Swiss-Prot record:
This protein's pathway: Aromatic compound metabolism; 3-chlorocatechol degradation
Binding partners and assembly: Homodimer.
Source domain of life: Bacteria
One annotated GO biological process: 3-chlorocatechol catabolic process
Xref: InterPro entries: ADH_Fe/GldA, ADH_Fe_C, Alcohol_dehydrogenase_Fe, MAR
Phylogenetic lineage: Bacteria, Pseudomonadati, Pseudomonadota, Betaproteobacteria, Burkholderiales
Protein name (database record): Maleylacetate reductase 2
Record comment: activity regulation: Inhibited by p-chloromercuribenzoate and by 3-oxoadipate, and, in a temperature-dependent manner, by manganese.
pH-activity note: Optimum pH is 7.5.
Protein's job: Plays a major role in the degradation of chloroaromatic compounds by channeling maleylacetate and some of its substituted derivatives into the 3-oxoadipate pathway. This enzyme converts maleylacetate and 2-chloromaleylacetate with similar efficiencies. NADH is preferred to NADPH as the cosubstrate.
Length: 359
C-alpha cells in the first residue's frame, strides 16, 4: 500500500459533527433529537463550571453531572461513573472536556451500552475515533470498537479561548501526532493523507498564535478544525511506534497524555524518516519546512515554540524506566514503517528523556 490512487479501502464513521462558535447552545436540541429522557454530564473536576452551565442549559433533560473523569481511564473510575448514571436514571451522557472525559464516556458506551454526545474542550481528537483505552494494574489496554463513537460531536472554539498556553501547546502537538502517524500507516489512503496534511498545516499555522494569544478566536477555530481532521484520520487508520510508546509510558508511569505525545513525536518522526521519506517529506512541507530530514527537526522546533515541558524528565518519567518501557513496547505487534529493536527504542527514549534534538 503506497497511499496512491491505484488501490485502497476507505472507511468513514457515521458521526454527526456540529462545528462553530456558539454550537454549545445546540446541545439540548441534540439530546432531544436522540430521543433521550435524562442526560448525565461527565467532566473532570477542573471542568465543573462548564459542566454545570451545560446542565443548566439542559433544563428538565439534565440528570446531574459527574466529575470523576481521570487521565488514562482507570477501571475504578468507570465503575463509579456507571453507578452515577444508574443513580441518576440517565439514558444519555454528555461528555464535556478532553481525552479523559471522552475516554470515560467511551468506556461507559462499550461496557454499559450508553450513548453520548461530546463537547471537546481540547485538541485530543478522541471524540472522532472508535479507539478506547482502559488502565488496570499498571497497564493500559486499547482497542477499536464502533460502539464507542459518540452520536454527535459539537465543536465550539469559544471553550478553547480559556485554555492556558501550557495546555494549548501540548494538546495541539498531540493532534499533530495523530496526523503524522496516519501519513505512513499501512492502511492509509489518498483521503486520509489529504486530511492529515491539511490538519498538520492548519495546526502549524494556528497553534503558535493560540499559545501566544489564547483569546484569539480565529486561531482557536483554525486549531480546532485541525484537531477534528486529526481525530478523523486517527479513527480511519492504524497507528505506529509513537502511539505504542505513549500507551506504554502512560499506563506504566501515569505520564500526562498530551505532553507525552508532544515530547515523543519529534523523536519518533526522526527515527521513521529513513523508512518513510516521501510521507514525512510531505509532513515537513505541511509544517513549512520542506526538504529531506525536515519533519523531526520541524516538529522539535514547534515543540520548543509552543510547549514549556520539552523532555520526558520534565513530565515525570523516571530514568530507570527507559529499558522497562522499551521491553514492554516490543510485547505487542504494531504497524510502523521501520522495525525497532529494544536498543533502538531505548536510544529514542533516552533522547526524549533529556529533550535533545532528535537524531
Amino acid at each position: 500500500m503506497t497511499g496512491d490512487l491505484n488501490e485502497f479501502v476507505a472507511h468513514f464513521w457515521p458521526v454527526r459533527v456540529v462545528f462553530g462558535a456558539g454550537s454549545t447552545e445546540r446541545i439540548p436540541a441534540e439530546v432531544k433529537r436522540l430521543g433521550a429522557r435524562r442526560a448525565l454530564v461527565l467532566c473532570t473536576p477542573d471542568q465543573r463550571d462548564l459542566a454545570q452551565r451545560v446542565l443548566g442549559d439542559l433544563g428538565d433533560l439534565g440528570a446531574g453531572f459527574h466529575d470523576g473523569a481521570v487521565m488514562h481511564v482507570p477501571e475504578a473510575s468507570v465503575t463509579r461513573a456507571a453507578q452515577a448514571a444508574r443513580d441518576a436514571d440517565a439514558d444519555l451522557l454528555v461528555a464535556v472536556g478532553g481525552g479523559s472525559t471522552i475516554g470515560l464516556a467511551k468506556a461507559l458506551a462499550l461496557h454499559h451500552g450508553m450513548r453520548f454526545v461530546a463537547l471537546p474542550t481540547t485538541y485530543a481528537g478522541s471524540e472522532m475515533t472508535p479507539i478506547w483505552g482502559l488502565t488496570a494494574d499498571g497497564a493500559k489496554r486499547t482497542g477499536r470498537d464502533p460502539r464507542v463513537l459518540p452520536s454527535t460531536v459539537l465543536y465550539d472554539p469559544h471553550h478553547l479561548t480559556s485554555l492556558p498556553p501550557e495546555v494549548t501547546g501540548p494538546s495541539g502537538m498531540n493532534a499533530i501526532a495523530h496526523a503524522v502517524e496516519s501519513m505512513y500507516a499501512p492502511d492509509r489512503n489518498p483521503i486520509t493523507m489529504l486530511l492529515a496534511e491539511e490538519s498538520i498545516r492548519a495546526m502549524a499555522q494556528g497553534l503558535p498564535v493560540a499559545v501566544d494569544s489564547p483569546g484569539d478566536l480565529d486561531a482557536r477555530t483554525r486549531t480546532l478544525y485541525a484537531a477534528w481532521l486529526a481525530g478523523t484520520v486517527l479513527g480511519m487508520v492504524s497507528m505506529g511506534l509513537h502511539h505504542k510508546l505513549c500507551h506504554v509510558l502512560g499506563g506504566r508511569f501515569n505520564l500526562p497524555h498530551a505532553p507525552m505525545h508532544a515530547v515523543l513525536l519529534p523523536h519518533v518522526a526522526a527515527f521513521n524518516e529513513v523508512a518513510a521519506p516521501a510521507e514525512l517529506g510531505r509532513v515537513a512541507a505541511a509544517l513549512g519546512a520542506p526538504g529531506p530530514g525536515g519533519a523531526g527537526a520541524a516538529l522539535h522546533a514547534l515543540l520548543r515554540f509552543t510547549c514549556t515541558e520539552r523532555s520526558l524528565a520534565a513530565i515525570g518519567m523516571p530514568a530507570q524506566g527507559i529499558y522497562d518501557a522499551a521491553e514492554h513496547a516490543l510485547a505487542d505487534a504494531y504497524a510502523n514503517p521501520r522495525q525497532a529493536s529494544r536498543e533502538d527504542i531505548a536510544r529514542l527514549l533516552r533522547a526524549a528523556f533529556t529533550g535533545e534534538m532528535p537524531a
